[in-house]
Swiss-Prot record:
Gene3D superfamilies: Ribosomal protein L9, C-terminal domain, Ribosomal protein L9, N-terminal domain. The lineage of its organism: Bacteria, Pseudomonadati, Chlorobiota, Chlorobiia, Chlorobiales. It holds the Pfam family Ribosomal_L9_C. GO terms for biological process: translation. Belongs to the bacterial ribosomal protein bL9 family. It comes from the Bacteria. This is Large ribosomal subunit protein bL9.
Length: 151
């Protein structure tokens, strides 16, 4: 029996795949558990239109991510942290601090999408990578300054 998988199944395939399985397996397990549906002409057409819509949606998200990347590259971010007289920070600058600085500039980016090469424990200029989409990553330049010493 031909079925369309609605969920990923390790032994059969990924969601959206059309696979052939034994009738008993489909009727007694896959279909009742909502893991798969019967592959009829109507469901195959619906699957195809859904894939096209999904592809358009992904392309729009990718385009939006590229536009955001261009804007973020132009930014001159400043991150403020408490520091001692010698310029050494009390603590470290984290991806959450960078996400907060980006939010202040109008970019809502999750801290888990920001990667910092090494811990930042001093004042100065640094760079972090921001992954906006699966294939869109942008380098963010930022400067760590001591709190209360705005220029």
């Amino acid at each position: 029996m031909k079925v369309i998988l609605r969920k990923d199944v390790a032994t059969l395939g990924d969601a959206g795949d059309v696979v052939i399985v034994k009738n008993g397996y489909a009727n007694n397990y896959l279909i009742p558990q909502s893991i798969a549906i019967r592959a009829t002409e109507g469901t195959l057409k619906a699957l195809e239109t859904e894939r096209k819509q999904q592809a358009r949606k992904v392309e729009m998200q990718r385009k939006h991510a590229r536009e955001q990347a261009q804007k973020i590259e132009q930014l001159a971010l400043k991150v403020f942290a408490r520091a001692g007289e010698s310029g050494k920070l009390f603590g470290t600058v984290t991806s959450a601090d960078i996400a907060e600085a980006l939010k202040a500039q109008g970019f809502e980016i999750d801290r888990r999408k920001i990667t910092i090469e090494a811990p930042i424990k001093a004042l100065g200029k640094f760079e972090a990578a921001v992954k906006l989409f699966s294939d869109v990553t942008v380098a963010v330049q930022f400067e760590v300054e001591a709190e209360g010493m705005e220029a």
